[in-house]
Structures are given as structure tokens and as C-alpha cells.
């Protein structure tokens, strides 16, 4: 046998050994305990591809910066998660959300997802054409309520009620919670990525007075995340519109008591109770009360239960700045309400949870309720061809010590 033939035989034997070695069982120490299969993240939720905007960090971990934003076009462009680098902590979840696999199981259109309700239980759902609650006359079957705007009847899903016996069903948080988005496009920018899309809402499933297009832009950069919605009346009748957002902001340390909240609102709307959370029409000055979070550095959340609406908002450089600070994590996030139409801020922060939902919105709760005695409650009137834009920006900061 030639030297060349011997070489080829040895090479073949080595190849066979190598392949067999790749298939051999792991050592007993590795296989003694069966390992659970890792959950496979879904590629779609709501019948549309999940969009993840990403960017590479540029500060070597020395300053706070946003890293990613996950958006669900199949669920009304819900901003499901945002991640950021925090010096000393590394990458953290900015929003309180389950895994994508768990979210897909919850966002299933079942009994707990009526009208898309599960969308506003985590992440950041957009609330159009009305944030908050709307009361009205309940239908005989208990499925809808009717209310009036400028003498015209509006029928809405009665998709929510409190937990107490006899709680009144009402409409809650808009009509796009489970909507699909058209023309979804992503673009790489100088310092991140942007996603855009349009919800051709029409008359919102027969519930609204005209036809509406909603144009979304979610922009990720290192120093900010911007969310913008423009609503345009593309129908033939005038219509009311309000826009809001329902992001659940994490408290990274998990220590809710020491977390601080700053809300530049001089009054809150009194509610009947924290189960219905229906406004009474009375606006109460916050000065001297536990609801006074106007100090520049805010005050600790401590054990205060919040599901309250602030108004008479003071602006800084034209924006309504609400701050959530976690001193234990050396972390702060600023929610800047840029649109002049933003009239109120709702904050939902139960003392047993490690988040604060900060909702910058156009309107008061139950905006057409008789309790307001004709007051301007923030609903914007769009005539055919008119539009209005809601714009909120998130900015990270390091709190002063």
C-alpha cells in the first residue's frame, strides 16, 4: 500500500471517529438530572410578526442607554418590552412583562382577553380612541353600553368592571387593543432603529362616528425612546378622539417603598372607590395631601396605593415630565408628554407590585359623564380631514445622591 493510500485510510478513520464522538452520550454527571426544555419564543403574536428594534451599546456600560424595544403589531402596536443598560446592573427590563411565550398564551382572544383586555395587563398598550373609563347605559345582555357625544349615540363594548359584587360594567381603554397593523416597516437610523405602521381603524368595528387612520412611529435610540401616534379623520363626520399609553415601568431593585415618583400635577380627580375608579367630578388640590408628588425629586411611593388621575399639569420646556426613580438601583426614567393635548396623567401603582404604570393621556376618566357638568375633559374633536398627534418620549437618567 502506498504512503498516500495509508494517509487516506488514516484520515477516513479519524473522520469516522470524530462523527461518532459527536453523537456519544454525555457523561453521567451531565445526564443524571433531566433538564427542562427551554421555552421557544413565538415569532408571531396576534397573527403578525413580532418586531424587535435593537442597537449596540456605545458607553461601555458607564452611562444609562436604551438597548432594545419589542413591539407587537398584531396587538395594536403594544410596546411589549424595552431593555436598557444601567451602570452597575447591566441590562434590565424597563417594562413589567412576562416572557413572549407566556404573553402569547394570554393574548389569545379568550374570556380574559375580551376586547383585547389582556393587552393592558403588561407591557405598554396604546389606548385609542379613548383611554380610561367610559360609563353609560348597560344593554339588556350586559355586553355594551351607550353614551352620547354632541347629541349622537355611541355604543361601546362593556369590557370591564370592578371585582366587588354588583360592580358596574363599563368601557375601558379603547378599541385597538387587539388590532392588526398594516404597512409595518423598520428602518435603521444613526443610533438605533424605528418601526412604523398604520391601523386603518375605520369606525372601530362599528363603535365610532367616523372613520380613522392611526399612524404609529416607535423610535429607539441610545438616549430616548419616542412613541408617536397621529389620528386622522378619514371619514365624513366629526368625531371625538383621545389617545393614551399604558406602560408598566419596572422598579429594578424590587424595593417599591423607596422608589420615588414625581408628577407635576396640582390636582387629582376624586373617585368613588378604587374598585370602580369612577370620577365624582370633584378636582382636589394635592398640596398637603399624600397625592402631592410635585417636588422636583418626587417622594417615596412607600405603601401608598395609587390609581389616580392628575391634572392642572405643569410643563418643563413644553413637556409634562413624570419621573420614576429607583435610588437603590441608581436608576431613573423620565416620561415626557410632549403633545400639548396631553391634559391628564393616570398612575396605577399597587403597593404589592414592583411597577408603576404611568399613563400620559388627553382626557379625564368618563369624559362624557354628567359629573363634569360640561367641563372640557380633553376629548379632541376631529372634523373630516383633520388630525391630532400624541407624542411621548422616554429618557433615562441617573438620580442625584
Report each predicted region and the residues it spans.
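C-terminal motif of bacterial Sec signal peptides marking the signal peptidase cleavage site
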Residues: 18-21
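Bacterial N-terminal signal peptides that target proteins for export
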Residues: 1-9
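Short, conserved catalytic or interaction motifs in soluble domains
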Residues: 24
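Surface-exposed acidic/polar loop and edge beta-strand patches at domain peripheries
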Residues: 28-228, 234-243, 247-401
Amino acid at each position: 500500500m502506498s504512503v498516500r493510500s495509508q494517509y487516506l485510510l488514516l484520515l477516513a478513520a479519524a473522520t469516522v471517529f470524530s462523527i461518532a464522538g459527536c453523537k456519544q452520550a454525555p457523561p453521567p454527571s451531565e445526564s443524571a438530572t433531566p433538564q427542562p426544555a427551554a421555552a421557544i419564543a413565538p415569532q408571531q403574536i396576534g397573527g403578525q410578526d413580532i418586531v424587535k428594534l435593537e442597537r449596540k451599546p456605545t458607553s461601555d456600560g458607564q452611562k444609562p442607554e436604551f438597548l432594545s424595544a419589542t413591539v407587537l403589531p398584531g396587538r395594536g402596536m403594544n410596546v411589549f418590552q424595552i431593555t436598557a443598560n444601567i451602570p452597575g446592573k447591566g441590562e434590565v427590563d424597563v417594562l413589567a412583562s412576562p416572557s413572549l411565550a407566556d404573553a402569547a398564551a394570554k393574548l389569545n382572544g379568550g374570556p380574559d382577553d375580551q376586547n383585547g383586555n389582556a393587552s393592558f395587563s403588561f407591557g405598554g398598550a396604546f389606548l385609542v380612541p379613548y383611554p380610561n373609563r367610559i360609563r353609560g347605559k348597560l344593554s339588556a345582555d350586559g355586553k355594551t353600553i351607550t353614551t352620547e357625544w354632541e347629541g349622537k349615540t355611541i355604543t361601546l363594548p362593556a369590557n370591564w368592571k370592578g371585582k366587588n359584587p354588583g360592580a358596574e360594567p363599563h368601557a375601558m381603554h379603547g378599541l385597538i387593543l387587539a388590532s392588526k397593523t398594516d404597512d409595518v416597516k423598520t428602518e435603521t437610523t444613526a443610533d438605533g432603529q424605528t418601526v412604523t405602521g398604520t391601523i386603518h381603524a375605520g369606525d372601530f368595528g362599528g363603535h365610532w362616528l367616523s372613520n380613522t387612520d392611526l399612524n404609529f412611529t416607535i423610535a429607539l435610540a441610545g438616549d430616548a425612546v419616542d412613541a408617536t401616534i397621529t389620528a386622522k379623520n378619514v371619514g365624513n363626520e366629526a368625531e371625538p378622539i383621545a389617545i393614551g399609553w399604558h406602560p408598566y415601568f419596572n422598579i429594578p431593585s424590587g424595593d417599591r417603598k423607596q422608589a420615588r415618583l414625581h408628577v407635576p400635577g396640582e390636582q387629582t380627580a376624586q373617585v368613588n372607590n378604587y374598585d370602580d375608579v369612577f370620577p365624582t367630578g370633584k378636582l382636589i388640590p394635592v398640596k398637603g395631601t399624600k397625592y402631592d408628588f410635585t417636588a422636583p425629586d418626587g417622594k417615596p411611593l412607600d405603601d401608598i396605593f395609587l390609581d389616580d388621575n392628575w391634572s392642572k399639569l405643569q410643563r418643563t420646556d413644553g413637556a409634562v415630565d413624570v419621573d420614576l426613580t429607583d435610588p437603590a438601583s441608581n436608576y431613573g426614567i423620565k416620561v415626557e408628554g410632549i403633545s400639548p393635548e396631553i391634559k391628564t396623567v393616570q398612575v396605577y401603582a399597587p403597593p404589592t407590585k414592583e411597577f408603576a404604570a404611568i399613563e400620559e393621556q388627553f382626557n379625564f376618566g368618563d369624559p362624557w359623564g354628567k359629573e363634569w357638568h360640561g367641563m372640557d375633559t380633553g376629548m379632541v374633536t376631529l372634523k373630516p380631514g383633520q388630525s391630532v398627534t400624541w407624542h411621548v418620549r422616554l429618557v433615562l437618567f441617573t438620580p442625584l445622591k
